[in-house]
Regions:
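Pseudouridine synthases involved in rRNA/tRNA modification
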Residues: 5-32, 190-203, 221-284
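Short, surface-exposed secondary-structure edge patches
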Residues: 47-51, 207, 246
Length: 284
């Protein structure tokens, strides 16, 4: 639904709606509730086109059966957890969320302790990793925490570090600013180690800091400078695709200020074993 005064743009209208109902901490969740007819204005089912100007009675009615949700039995490594948020390890070969049952999001209730806070909700990831990418994922456990963590990402107050193994002879460090889908994007990199490879010339362990958050940003950026990530089937050079061993891209750490306790958090998720094998004489 929309305000007819005061908040002129769509983004602010959606933010207003999210602020009303703590059961729906994100704009996408609010839209789903509207589509399912859970929200009424003055007793009439609302839609995204419903206008409000002040003084209306807005109500939420969720059928009881929709509050229960099957959880996916996938054991997860929990790296950090409190009543507000959690940080978990995402294995390769699973979606973070989406319209499937076997997702990381659906496995969270079995792996996390229920929050004792008043606005506790079903745990939700607040960002995504690609299907083949491993590593660290941040999760909100309360409605207010999910909103606060989303805001930290929007304001670029969460520092993300990735590691990848790339192909070819690279400069020691650099900044990639190739636009993605016509929009500015920036990634900083530093080569930590390099080893010769009969098939690939050189393989490099690269530390990566994405400064923007575009879809497939690191994969596209490294491909754009001629040094694709090992195992990447979508962004690869002819004849240099490694099959059967997955994508060598790992979300290594997150650093940010806890939005409620204000404690600094720096949480890491160690490199997969397959990364180390390349640099200890076993190759690929």
């Amino acid at each position: 639904f929309c305000l007819s005064r005061g908040l002129g743009d769509v983004y602010k209208r959606q933010e207003y709606g999210v602020g009303i109902f703590e059961a729906f901490p994100t704009k996408s969740a609010l839209k789903k509730a509207l589509k399912k007819g859970y929200i009424k204005v003055d007793g009439v089912i609302a839609s995204t086109a419903t206008l409000i100007s002040g003084g209306e009675q807005i109500s939420l009615d969720i059928p009881l059966e929709t509050t229960t949700k099957r959880s996916f039995a996938l054991p997860l490594n929990v790296l950090f957890e409190d009543d507000y948020l959690a940080v978990i390890h995402k294995p390769a070969g699973i979606e973070v969320s989406g319209n499937k049952f076997k997702t990381l999001a659906n496995a969270l209730p079995r792996n996390l302790e229920p929050s004792s806070l008043y606005d506790a909700t079903i745990p939700q990831p607040v960002h995504r990793l690609d299907y083949a990418t491993t590593g660290i994922v941040l999760v909100g456990k309360t409605a207010s925490s999910i909103r606060a963590l989303n805001k930290l990402f929007e304001e670029k107050k969460i520092d993300k570090t990735y590691y990848a193994i790339t192909i070819g002879t690279m400069k020691r460090n650099g900044r990639i600013e190739t636009a993605i889908d016509g929009k500015p994007a920036q990634s900083d990199y530093e080569v930590m180690k390099s080893v010769p490879s009969d098939r690939f010339g050189f393989l490099n362990l690269v530390n990566l800091h994405p400064k923007t958050g575009k879809r497939h940003q690191l994969r596209k950026h490294l491909f754009s400078i001629g040094h694709p990530i090992l195992g990447d089937k979508d962004y690869a050079l002819d004849g240099l695709i490694l099959k059967g061993k997955g994508l060598y891209l790992h979300a290594y750490s997150l650093e940010f200020e806890h939005p409620f306790t204000k404690n600094p958090l720096h949480i890491t998720d160690g490199l997969p074993e397959k990364f180390g094998k390349i640099f200890h004489g076993k190759g690929v």
